[in-house]
A protein has these predicted regions:
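Intrinsically disordered, low-complexity regulatory regions
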Residues: 1-115
């Protein structure tokens, strides 16, 4: 990669091709707030915010949880009775947990994300 070092009086930011994480907040603010409510409920139930990552056989158990919430949603139950939150937020939270477990297992992909 080469950089243009000339000063033309305009600001430059060489971030082409890098992850646009901030865009998530602008594009999906309500969905992220809903997922955040799931996290808030979880930290009240399990005080250690990293508890989810310590669960034995977490990948399979969170996959099962995702599927349970998805099936309940498709069966017509929109809101989880325990949390009073829509099942779709739990589906998304579980998908994020599954993605993290995947990255823990595949360190080469994890390292590539942070380049």
């Amino acid at each position: 990669m080469t950089y243009d070092l000339t000063d033309d009086g305009t600001g430059k930011k060489y971030d082409s091709g890098k992850s646009m994480v901030g865009t998530l907040c602008r594009v999906f603010p309500r969905a992220l707030l809903g997922i955040g409510k799931c996290i808030t409920f979880g930290t009240k139930k399990y005080p250690n915010p990293k508890n989810w990552s310590l669960v034995e056989d977490g990948l399979n158990r969170y996959t099962d949880s995702l599927m349970r919430h998805l099936l309940k949603m498709f069966a017509g139950q929109e809101v989880d009775p325990e949390t009073n939150l829509p099942h779709i937020f739990h589906v998304c939270w579980n998908a994020l947990a599954i993605a993290e477990f995947y990255l823990m297992k595949h360190k080469e992909i994890d390292e590539e994300l942070f380049k």
